[in-house]
């Protein structure tokens, strides 16, 4: 009786015309990026940072982040891609790793701030809430592709969590219902976004960089536990790579936060002085 609610999976293709195919995955990711950019520009204006700096940063960061995200994924799936090299560039089918994108964007930000004489800590504090918002939105691309899911479960169990039927139906994959880990991470990210925006508007209580460090710890903490429920984790032997990185990032951010608290780091300020 429970399985009577099963419906066909949603079409991952948004638009198709001639040789051109646009996937929902790309549309959703792009929407998250655009919203993040608009929010960063708004927050940057409050700190006296010209909006062109954010456009210029994105111009460099976006392609490099995508490349790094894909490289990260391919490296840890090399046993497959070494046999299917033509699929290495097929990012429209999914297969990018957020940690790779974050690392790529972070490196670009440090270089960009150096040459623009901007405070890297201030820029990271501005970008952190927008980034986790984009991450929360982007997880719905995984939903459309029926990926980033967890172990086998039952429809009754999903209904008991008050998950809408249209999400439950999409979680019917390969003849089984799956734990919607994409949903858990999306909700975790969007909750983190609300928290970080609250901190941004109470920044007088913080030192420079602490909002960004809070983002790192928040995301790493949630990702560690959610990753443990997934069945498609990138592995290094028996170790889930994302869980390992989550531990490294959480501990590193906590140590940096403690060190900066014990140093004579100025409390939050307005302005774009380089530090």
From Swiss-Prot:
A 1,2-diacyl-sn-glycero-3-phospho-(1'-sn-glycerol) binds at residue 139. Pathway: Protein modification; lipoprotein biosynthesis (diacylglyceryl transfer). It is found in: Cell membrane. It comes from Limosilactobacillus reuteri (strain DSM 20016). This is Phosphatidylglycerol--prolipoprotein diacylglyceryl transferase. Catalyzes the transfer of the diacylglyceryl group from phosphatidylglycerol to the sulfhydryl group of the N-terminal cysteine of a prolipoprotein, the first step in the formation of mature lipoproteins. Keywords: Cell membrane, Membrane, Transferase, Transmembrane, Transmembrane helix. It is a multi-pass membrane protein. It is an enzyme of class 2 (transferase). Belongs to the Lgt family. GO terms for molecular function: phosphatidylglycerol-prolipoprotein diacylglyceryl transferase activity. Pfam families: LGT. PANTHER family: PHOSPHATIDYLGLYCEROL--PROLIPOPROTEIN DIACYLGLYCERYL TRANSFERASE, PROLIPOPROTEIN DIACYLGLYCERYL TRANSFERASE. GO terms for cellular component: plasma membrane. The chain crosses the membrane at residues 20-40, 58-78, 88-108, 118-138, 209-229, 239-259.
């Amino acid at each position: 009786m429970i399985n009577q609610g099963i419906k066909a999976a949603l079409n991952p293709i948004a638009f198709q015309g001639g040789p051109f195919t646009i996937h929902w995955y790309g549309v959703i990711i792009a929407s998250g990026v655009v919203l993040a950019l608009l929010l960063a520009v708004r927050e940057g204006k409050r700190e006296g940072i010209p909006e062109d700096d954010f456009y210029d940063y994105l111009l460099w960061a976006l392609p490099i982040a995508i490349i790094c995200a894909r490289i990260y994924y391919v490296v840890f799936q090399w046993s497959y891609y070494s046999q299917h090299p033509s699929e290495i560039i097929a990012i429209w089918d999914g297969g990018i790793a957020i940690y790779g994108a974050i690392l790529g964007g972070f490196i670009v930000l440090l270089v960009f701030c150096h040459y623009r004489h901007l405070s890297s800590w201030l820029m990271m504090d501005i970008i952190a809430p927008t980034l986790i918002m984009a991450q929360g939105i982007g997880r719905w691309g995984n939903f459309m592709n029926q990926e980033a899911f967890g172990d086998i479960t039952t429809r009754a169990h999903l209904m008991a969590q008050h998950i809408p039927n249209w999400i439950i139906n999409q979680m019917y994959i390969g003849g089984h219902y799956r734990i919607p880990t994409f949903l858990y991470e999306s909700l975790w990210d969007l909750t983190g976004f609300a928290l970080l925006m609250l901190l941004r508007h109470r920044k007088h209580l913080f030192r420079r960089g602490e909002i960004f460090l809070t983002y790192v710890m928040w995301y790493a903490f949630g990702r560690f536990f959610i990753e443990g429920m997934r069945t498609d984790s990138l592995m290094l032997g028996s170790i889930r790579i994302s869980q390992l990185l989550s531990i490294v990032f959480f501990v590193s951010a906590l140590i940096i936060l403690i060190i900066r608290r014990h140093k004579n780091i100025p409390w939050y300020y307005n302005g774009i002085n380089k530090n």
